[in-house]
Regions:
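Cysteine/selenocysteine-centered motifs that mediate thiol-based redox chemistry or coordinate metal-sulfur cofactors
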Residues: 33-40, 121-132
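Extended hydrophobic
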Residues: 44-122
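Amphipathic alpha-helical effector-binding/dimerization core
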Residues: 1-37
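Glycine-rich, flexible loop/turn motifs
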Residues: 1-3, 7-9, 31, 40, ...
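Basic side chains
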Residues: 4, 20, 79, 113, ...
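Aromatic-residue detector
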Residues: 12-14, 70, 80, 127-130
């Protein structure tokens, strides 16, 4: 699995698990502005979602499930799962993800990774709450 992350490399919100989590939990007017005014959609792989309506549906699903998935949408052979870190008294403060070879992120493996990340998100949220 020859995948390397380049420090400082950026990617659009709509095609990464971290970005999709950020989109899903931003205020609805910000999401609309992003989808209709701010972004020029680029297809990175045949799986990249570039239609605003599909991305709105994806955001709703992410809010419902509590995690996002990048299904090789930014890079072939790489899948990612992302979760938000939310504080009840504020807006989203962080997000984090796990990435790996697509073969390691299917079916129950994907659900297990999402569950582990959600547990870590809860712990981070509790720690941030004690610091506030």
């Amino acid at each position: 699995f020859p995948y390397r992350t380049i420090i400082g490399e950026t990617a659009p919100l709509y095609c990464t698990s971290l970005g999709k989590v950020m989109m899903a939990f931003m205020p609805s007017e910000e999401l609309e502005a992003y989808l209709t005014q701010s972004v020029s959609f680029h297809t990175f792989t045949r799986y990249t979602i570039t239609e605003p309506d599909r991305l709105r549906q994806e955001a709703a699903l992410i809010r419902e499930k509590g995690f996002s998935v990048d299904n090789e949408e930014h890079e072939y052979g790489v899948k990612c799962v992302g979760v938000p870190v939310l504080l009840p008294e504020s807006s989203q403060v962080a997000a984090f993800s796990a990435s790996g070879p697509a073969s390691a992120f299917d079916g129950s493996d994907l659900e297990q990774k999402a569950k582990a990340l959600k547990e870590a998100s809860f712990l981070m949220r509790e720690r941030l709450r004690t610091l506030a």
